[in-house]
């Protein structure tokens, strides 16, 4: 399988591979910073231009999964969020291997920021883990927007 590897990421397993062998979930990894760098590369137009970039942006804005994660605290604001979720299986200890959300936020004043929250081996419920991501999203939004 062809993949992407760097000092801050190692991604070479497909979703199907990870469902068949849970150990593969731990072989695919990145940092939140590296995930945001990749997203910025895509959204800024450096990776794709014109219709291709617009397609990526609109696909992420229309994402319906994980509305209880990064988008949750933004629902009452005029910010626009595009995001993509990732949810892993439970390991042998009953932990959720990975609950993730990465996205970009357009503020009403025209500024934009990107955010990635990656939760590994959560012992919480799916709802409580989503709430952790939402809480981080809210804190970042309040800081960046100045709504403290």
PLM ranges: what are they?
Residues 1-8, 12:
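Single conserved hydrophobic/aromatic residue that forms the stacking wall/gate
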Residues 1, 23-25, 78:
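Alpha-helical hydrophobic/aromatic positions enriched in membrane-embedded helices and signal peptides
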Residues 15-23, 29:
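Flexible, solvent-exposed loop/hinge segments and secondary-structure transition points
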Residues 27, 31-148:
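Structured C-terminal helix/loop/strand segments within mature extracytoplasmic catalytic/sensor domains
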């Amino acid at each position: 399988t062809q993949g992407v590897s760097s000092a801050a990421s190692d991604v070479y397993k497909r979703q199907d591979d990870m469902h068949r062998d849970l150990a593969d979930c731990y072989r695919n990894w990145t940092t939140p910073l590296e995930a945001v760098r990749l997203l910025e590369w895509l959204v800024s137009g450096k990776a794709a231009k014109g219709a291709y970039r617009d397609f990526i942006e609109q696909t992420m804005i229309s994402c319906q999964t994980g509305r209880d994660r990064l988008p949750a605290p933004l629902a009452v604001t005029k910010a626009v969020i595009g995001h993509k979720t990732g949810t892993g299986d439970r390991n042998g200890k009953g932990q959720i291997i990975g609950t993730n959300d990465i996205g970009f936020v357009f503020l009403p004043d025209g500024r934009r920021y990107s955010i990635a929250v990656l939760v590994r081996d959560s012992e919480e419920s799916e709802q409580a883990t989503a709430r952790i991501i939402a809480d981080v999203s809210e804190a970042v939004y309040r800081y960046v927007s100045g709504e403290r």
